[in-house]
């Protein structure tokens, strides 16, 4: 795990010791210290996702793009990842998230854009957008069609 995160850090510095220190800080920040010597292939899905985020953070991005980060996770694992992503955001990284898991959207996002079939439907504050009648109709369906 640590070596994988170092690869991200080495993309911005050639100083191996500095990359190692940065990687260790990120591994600790993401709660993966107990796995730092583990092989990536031995990790579970939620741990692999955290590793991918750690590698990205090692590049010190201002903006982190995440495509379906909750995919393949159970509710408990999703909750842990939501907590991690909140900490990433609180540390100063802007998150752009494509996600269909609504409790993740509600807990992570301040601003939401809803799309359907490639078309923007509505954009605005999270609670306002999720209360939009068209959004509800598109994602939950109409009563008479159930």
Residue ranges and their predicted role:
Residues 1-146:
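Glycine-rich phosphate-binding loops of nucleotide-dependent enzymes
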């Amino acid at each position: 795990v640590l070596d994988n995160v170092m690869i991200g850090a080495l993309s911005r510095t050639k100083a191996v010791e500095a990359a190692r220190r940065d990687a260790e800080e990120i591994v600790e920040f993401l709660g993966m210290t107990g796995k730092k010597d583990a092989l990536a292939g031995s990790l579970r899905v939620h741990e692999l996702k955290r590793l991918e985020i750690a590698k990205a953070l090692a590049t010190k991005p201002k903006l982190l793009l995440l495509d379906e980060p909750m995919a393949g996770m159970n509710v408990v694992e999703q909750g842990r990842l939501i907590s991690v992503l909140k900490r990433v955001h609180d540390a100063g990284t802007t998150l752009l998230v494509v996600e269909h898991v609504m409790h993740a959207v509600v807990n992570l996002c301040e601003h939401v854009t809803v799309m359907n079939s490639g078309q923007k439907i509505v954009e605005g504050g999270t609670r306002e957008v999720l209360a939009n009648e068209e959004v509800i109709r598109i994602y939950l369906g109409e009563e008479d069609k159930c």
